[in-house]
Amino acid sequence: MTKILFMGRKRLSANLLRLLSSQNGIEIVGVLTDSHLQGSPTTAAAKELGLPLYTFDTALEAMKEGRLKYDLGLSVLYWRKLRDEFLTIPSLGTINFHPALLPEYKGTGGY
């Protein structure tokens, strides 16, 4: 079973979260999403699926305390630059999906 920390925002992320949560061999151990926005589609999907929600800071704290352990980080349209802990702690690393050319279309709404 691959344990995933899902990081995302927007509708595409929410749809992917729903798809991943239904797959055999995958366990979503937490969802890191927009703590500063009301009505985040990813937050709504996580609540609908009964998945633990984290802010950037609460995820870091849980990782450092050993309460949040995962094999793979998956960032899909996540708005914030990740700190080293998010890249080095998971045994399989972290994958980032950004649907636009970088660096030309960097940022949260560059596509």
What positions do the PLM features span?
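One-carbon transfer enzymes
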Residues: 1-111
